Design a protein with these regions (language model features):
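Acidic/charged, solvent-exposed loop-and-adjacent secondary-structure segments enriched in E/D, K/R, S/T
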Residues: 104-132
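Surface-exposed beta-loop interaction hotspot
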Residues: 136-141
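Bacterial N-terminal signal peptides
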Residues: 14-23
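Bacterial N-terminal signal peptides that target proteins for export
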Residues: 2-14
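Solvent-exposed coil/turn segments that connect beta secondary-structure elements
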Residues: 54, 71-73, 81-83, 96-97, ...
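N-terminal mature ectodomain segment of secretory-pathway/periplasmic proteins
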Residues: 30-104
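Gly/Pro-enriched, hydrophobic low-complexity segments
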Residues: 107-110, 131-133, 151-248
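Sec/Tat signal peptide C-region and signal peptidase I cleavage site
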Residues: 24-28
């Protein structure tokens, strides 16, 4: 049985917010430089996307659609539009705060930090994934551990370990960035060094002259055959977005 939305069920990589062009990385770039450039281009200055999310479980498959708006590094709104049981559920990231709206409760709730690692909408993504760039860059120390060639691209593999005393979920992350700026995969390890899950860019297309991961999949290692896949239906970048969009009032009562 799939979980219905509640403050305990959280969000994904926002379905396909853009990973834009990263200038070809060089050995002169530090691991942090490579990651920062990739994350800076993840959403452009602003973005709007329509995406679908497929949650595959042993007892069935669930499909949802959503709209996502982003502005800068710290503003994002995700609003589910279908199916009817999920329509109206929404998540707002504003700075370091994350809010959720459940239309059945007609209430906006600010998530505590302890809830950020929980499942979003019953998927394999979490609210923690919303604030990927800010938390990864600031909370971890980054080392370029490998450069390899694959599919006509150089792949820069970066190991990120948490800074001493910083409260984080993961004991380590391994991130791979292509030389064109696509975040190719992310591996997540627990505190004892065991890999827990992996997110991969499974399909990459060129949109507006940019390499764009139109299909991203999260898989949990101890759940073979199960996954959550986010597929981009349409997207646009560097657009004007009114400031009211990223407010708690609009989260609860969206304007047309």
């Amino acid at each position: 049985m799939f979980q219905s939305f509640s403050p305990r069920n959280l969000r994904p990589v926002i379905a396909a917010c853009a990973l834009l062009v990263l200038p070809a990385a060089s050995f002169a770039q530090s691991a942090e430089d490579i990651l920062r450039s990739a994350f800076d281009n993840w959403r452009a200055d602003s973005s709007h996307a329509v995406t679908s999310m497929t949650i595959k479980r042993s007892n069935g498959t669930r499909e949802m659609t959503m709209e996502t708006w982003t502005q800068g590094e710290d503003k994002a709104l995700v609003r589910f539009t279908a199916p009817a049981r999920d329509a109206g559920n929404a998540t707002l990231q504003f700075g370091t705060a994350t809010y959720v709206f459940n239309p059945k409760l007609n209430q906006v709730i600010k998530l505590p930090s302890s809830a950020m690692s929980q499942s979003w909408m019953g998927s394999d993504f979490s609210y923690e994934d919303l604030s990927r760039s800010e938390r990864v860059i600031g909370d971890y120390t980054h080392t370029l551990v490998e450069t390899r060639s694959e599919g006509g691209h150089k792949i820069y593999v970066i190991e990120s370990v948490p800074k001493r005393g910083v409260p984080v979920v993961w004991g380590k992350q391994v991130l791979a960035v292509r030389d064109d700026g696509v975040l190719y995969f992310v591996e997540y390890y627990d505190q004892v060094g065991e890999r827990v899950r992996v997110m991969s860019a499974d399909k990459i297309e060129t949109i507006d002259g940019r390499p764009y991961p139109v299909e991203m999949t999260m898989r949990v290692d101890d759940k073979p055959g199960e996954f959550t896949r986010v597929t981009t239906v349409s997207s646009e970048f560097n657009i004007d977005i009114p400031s009211y969009l990223f407010t708690k009032s609009n989260l609860q009562n969206p304007r047309d």
